[in-house]
């Protein structure tokens, strides 16, 4: 009888341990800034936006519990490298440098790099007009990289911010900022700040989800990619886009 009790107890302990592992494996940690309207932002103490809705759908389809981890954009890749998050969902652009380090999901947003100036500014129409000007970008963002790539002779005074550079442009403290076309249109509409887009986007960008190149993360990437494919096929991804942008930015 004692042996039977020990056997059952041992099996119960093993089952509990395995169950605990399974529960842990069903959580995916997604890093984002929570400061990039309307992709990821906080309103009335609630994290929301296009990226949040997309991940809630991915969670439902994969069976994973999605845990959002917010931090300044400049710290997100460090969190990915150290395993504090499984991926980053913050309009991450695929670049050659990033492809060498990370595995990427299929693109889920197609957009462009857009210059924004104070309303009434008629001197800036494109990237060449930024020479000699002070231009803001998010620290460590895709747009900082793009702007520096387009300024090989360092004629642009590039200022890096964690957030809220639109206020400085609206007040005339700096000349312009660079962000994605879709977000700038929504920002101008919702904030009522005296801002305007300057010319057409100067570069096309594709946004994707980066994962570490380990077997565990590759398996996770496959499940996320399958969910994105299904969402594209049944129209769920398009519907989320239309909710936030009144347009489909998920297709070329």
Residue ranges and their predicted role:
Residues 25-92, 100, 158, 234:
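Extracytoplasmic small-molecule ligand-binding "clamshell" domains
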Residues 33, 110-117, 185, 189-225, ...:
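Periplasmic-binding protein-like
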Residues 34-37, 47-57, 114-161, 181-183:
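Bilobed "Venus flytrap"/periplasmic-binding protein-like clamshell domains
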Residues 67-78, 122, 157-171, 182, ...:
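Short helix-initiation/N-cap motifs at beta->coil->alpha
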Residues 52-61, 121, 128, 139-142, ...:
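Extended ligand-binding regions for polar small-molecule ligands
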Residues 29, 64-65, 81-90, 133-134, ...:
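Alpha-to-beta junction loops
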Residues 142-159, 192, 197-198, 228-252:
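Ligand-binding clefts/hinges and TM-proximal coupling segments of bilobed small-molecule sensing domains
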Residues 60, 65-129, 195-203:
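Acidic, polar ligand-binding/catalytic clefts
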